[in-house]
Amino acid sequence: MKTIGLLGGMSWESTIPYYRLINEGIKQRLGGLHSAQVLLHSVDFHEIEECQRRGEWDKTGDILAEAALGLQRAGAEGIVLCTNTMHKGVHAIESRCSLPFLHIADATGRAITGAGMTRVALLGTRYTMEQDFYRGRVTEQFSINCLIPEADERAKINQIIFEELCLGQFTEASRAYYAQVIARLAEQGAQGVIFGCTEIGLLVPEERSVLPVFDTAAIHAEDAVAFMLS
């Protein structure tokens, strides 16, 4: 079994499911008392979020690259970045850390392609929904068209993520709002929906979505398990 290095804490609410899902995957594959060989570097999300708001993406990339190098020195054999949004800075990690990097958009793209879909809705932070680092990769590498909510919906989705979900607050009102947005995107022809923020799956259970759900945290964790046992 390879040792996986997790870059977490963005937010820590969604890092917990990564640890659980990876261990469950290892136990399911190997049985008995087997558990995952995991190293975790959890960053201070306050600093990361401030850099995001100021547009200081190079600084966030430096922080994560240094964390990845620390995991490499500690014995990690691959890197998993437990957040969608911070994949915007993946170039900094890949250019300075020689370990295999398991990109969350690649894992998600493979899952969508495997389900036979080419047109899906994308929910996430405003950075993930509006910028090209995530949508562009999914489109270019997997020929998947991502539909995003309207501007006012994107603003509210983003607000809920940072002001509620990242603080561990999960309300029925926000759950219903997300379900409403998903239903509207389904009417526009979306075949499925990407939960492109690792906290969204903590808020919206699959049964509340009219579309098949691609929960990026679960998909990414499954990809990590496959890598660890390869």
What are these regions (language model features)?
Residues 1-230:
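Non-catalytic structural scaffold of enzyme domains
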